[in-house]
Regions:
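Bacterial N-terminal signal peptides that target proteins for export
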Residues: 1-8
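Acidic/polar, low-complexity intrinsically disordered N-terminal segments immediately downstream
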Residues: 21-106, 114, 145-147, 155-157, ...
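C-terminal motif of bacterial Sec signal peptides marking the signal peptidase cleavage site
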Residues: 15-19
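Repetitive helical segments and hydrophobic/amphipathic motifs
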Residues: 11-12
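Beta-sheet ligand-binding and adhesion/scaffold domains
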Residues: 28, 110-165
Length: 165
């Protein structure tokens, strides 16, 4: 019994004395913070670079249950100007937006814009959503972005939104 205890203590000592050196291999050329900043800058430039703006196919309702609308968006600086079939023919709505990095690169409409925020504000008995909204998002995760097409996913309801240049 005494020999078993000695061998057990010796084995534990050997396991405890192994090297704690951990060399992590870099899989990327740059740090995650620099890559996130570069992606935010790239997406911001893509939004502003479309000469005629973007056509946003905006869907509302859980699992697209309430259909969608088309929004025409032009991004410049920190402002977005929008027009829609919901507004008058010559009416545009302007508000602030931002592209930021949270858990992913996100497009957020920061100030109230009734063409987008209307669907995310409480509507009372008009909706089936427990939050009382029509199921619209105003914060979107940028899934993919190119000069011709940007794919978004609503942060709260998860509906896929497509923007085409």
């Amino acid at each position: 019994m005494k020999n078993i205890t000695i061998y057990l203590l010796l084995a534990l000592a050997c396991l405890g004395l192994q090297s704690c050196l951990f060399q992590e291999e870099n899989y990327f050329d740059d740090s995650s913070a620099n890559r996130a900043t570069a992606d935010v800058n790239r997406c911001s430039e893509l939004l502003k670079a479309a000469p005629n703006g973007w056509v946003m196919e905006y869907y509302i309702g859980k699992d697209y249950s309430l259909g969608g609308i088309t929004l025409l968006c032009r991004f410049d600086g920190q402002r977005v100007t929008m027009a829609s079939q919901m507004s008058e023919a010559d009416e545009t709505v302007s508000s602030l937006y931002s592209v930021k990095s949270e858990q992913a690169t996100m497009l957020s409409f920061d100030t109230y814009n009734y063409l987008v925020h209307y669907f995310g504000q409480p509507q009372g008995s008009m909706s089936d959503d427990p939050n009382g909204t029509l199921g619209g998002d105003y914060e979107f995760i940028i899934s993919s972005a190119s000069a011709e097409r940007i794919e978004l996913k609503g942060k709260k309801y998860g509906n896929r939104i497509v923007m085409k240049a």
